[in-house]
């Protein structure tokens, strides 16, 4: 009996085949809409005095920063073809170098986090200076963390629809049509294929093996699990503004770091730190570290620094208010 699952033949990157609207693009549109509505809902629920027009300017800068940061990280860090260095306009355009429409093919969330902070910071110190958006910026980062995590899984579902970001070989896994096939002469490949019910003829040089659906696992933990922790646990123990955003960054980085062990390293990068070269299908080392894990460790440290800094800001405000009350 076959011990694997075939990738659904009816699932395609396009929502409707022949029409250049992809699940990936649709997922981002939905995540933006969910975040926009959910952040505004929290503002109203907590009676935070922010004008709608100021909020919309803030959200525009946040979305723009997240997209720019995500695209820059994806194209300049993960892509090693050099095409974006020689054709930098392709970073921001949904076309290839021959001007064929492709849509945006890649966003790196680590860069998205950075852009989602830098762009609004610039905006609140220019366009929105001396507004309540500037006053409540840290509170808005908390709201944004909760809102974004609630819709995050949609992006990973789109990755699954694209049959990308799949995991390592596993019995009972899914055979992704776009997965990198294995040379049948690699030690352990023929034995593994036989154990899951895949036949290899004497003339087969390559074979596609079942893999872990790591994009779905990432989506579950970095999306719903993180959202529930933020909404039902950390929101209740929050002591100061900015705390939830720092926790969110650390939670995301924590889950991402460990789930990366299940994920196939990026083909062009491989392992950034290779403690033990992989020469057979069964070999594995926790000390082989991918780019995603390095960036996740950096993100985790950034989240911790954010928590420490925002705690000092909160303590300073309390001290100033206490001194002011004492003088009065």
Curated annotation (Swiss-Prot):
The gene is lgt. Pfam families: LGT. It comes from the Bacteria. Catalyzes the transfer of the diacylglyceryl group from phosphatidylglycerol to the sulfhydryl group of the N-terminal cysteine of a prolipoprotein, the first step in the formation of mature lipoproteins. It comes from Borreliella burgdorferi (strain ZS7). It is found in: Cell inner membrane. PROSITE patterns: LGT (PS01311). A 1,2-diacyl-sn-glycero-3-phospho-(1'-sn-glycerol) binds at residue 156. Its main location: membrane. One of its GO terms (biological process) is lipoprotein biosynthetic process. The chain crosses the membrane at residues 15-35, 57-77, 106-126, 242-262, 289-309. InterPro entries: Lgt (IPR001640). NCBIfam families: lgt (TIGR00544). Signal peptide: none annotated. It is a multi-pass membrane protein. The keyword Cell inner membrane applies. This is Phosphatidylglycerol--prolipoprotein diacylglyceryl transferase. GO terms for cellular component: plasma membrane. Belongs to the Lgt family. Pathway: Protein modification; lipoprotein biosynthesis (diacylglyceryl transfer). Keywords: Cell inner membrane, Cell membrane, Membrane, Transferase, Transmembrane, Transmembrane helix. One of its GO terms (molecular function) is phosphatidylglycerol-prolipoprotein diacylglyceryl transferase activity. Its EC number is 2.5.1.145.
